[in-house]
Amino acid sequence: MIEDKRWGGVYSFEDSPYIMEILTELRDKDTDSIKFRKGLVKLGRYMGYEITKTMDVEKVKVETPLEETEGIIVKDRRNVVIITVLRAAIPFMEGLIKVFEHARVGIVSAARGKPPKFEIEMNYIKIPQITPEDTVIVADPMIATGSTLLRVLEEVKKYGTPKRTLVVGVLAAPEGITRIKEKFPEVEIFVAKIDRELNDKGYILPGLGDAGDRAFGEPVKITTLPQVHYIE
């Protein structure tokens, strides 16, 4: 885990060969949706393991079949709220929840608009109550302009003040990190890698493309919804 000195509380896992190998497969344009989803699950899981190293632990006594010895429990692991930003974060969250199996889960549906404004539309929000003992993990694979996460973090504030708030992703652009840290300096950011920059469409370079489309397929744009008839 490497802290980036350009900001406080921003970490990458570029020193982990295995995490970098998974990221390499995700970047590959020939990686199919099945492998892409599995890669996001693996990244969520291994990044979750790394994040536990930053959490408070407690020493405990444990009885083995032979004698008593000393062990530890990761206290904060039992008080986690994972906020999932649909849709690319679904497999990523699946990996995180393998580490934080006690986590309560919130769901946010957010869509980023077109450049240059990149306005965010949020049409579904379900977040559990947040307590001062909680660590909130906002899971979003791609931290590009930061617009989506700024809106999500504003919503999270309405549900309580946690012990810590973490934004966890796969890739980030410096532009998005800067915007988040300017508005929410207390938020910690963990990503597999910080990439070079954004292009004029707001995509991360070199990036890995649209994570949602690559994981689940490109959606078909329907201008009118089909009429549904209900039978009583």
Swiss-Prot record:
Enzyme Commission no: 2.4.2.9
Activity regulation field: Allosterically activated by GTP.
Membrane-crossing segments per the record: none
Positions bound to GTP: K38, G39, L40, V41, K42
Principal EC category: transferase
Record: residues binding uracil: I204, G209, D210, A211
One GO term (biological process): uracil salvage
Molecular-function GO terms, alphabetical: GTP binding; magnesium ion binding; uracil phosphoribosyltransferase activity
Pathway noted in the entry: Pyrimidine metabolism; UMP biosynthesis via salvage pathway; UMP from uracil: step 1/1
Residues annotated to bind 5-phospho-alpha-D-ribose 1-diphosphate: R87, R112, D140, P141, M142, I143, A144, T145, G146, S147, T148, D210
InterPro entries in the cross-refs: PRibTrfase_dom (IPR000836), PRTase-like (IPR029057), Upp_A (IPR034331), UPRTase/APRTase (IPR050054), Ura_phspho_trans (IPR005765)
Cofactor annotation comment: Binds 1 Mg(2+) ion per subunit. The magnesium is bound as Mg-PRPP.
Entry cofactors: Mg(2+)
HAMAP family: Upp_A
Family statement: Belongs to the UPRTase family.
Function comment: Catalyzes the conversion of uracil and 5-phospho-alpha-D-ribose 1-diphosphate (PRPP) to UMP and diphosphate.
Protein's name in the database: Uracil phosphoribosyltransferase
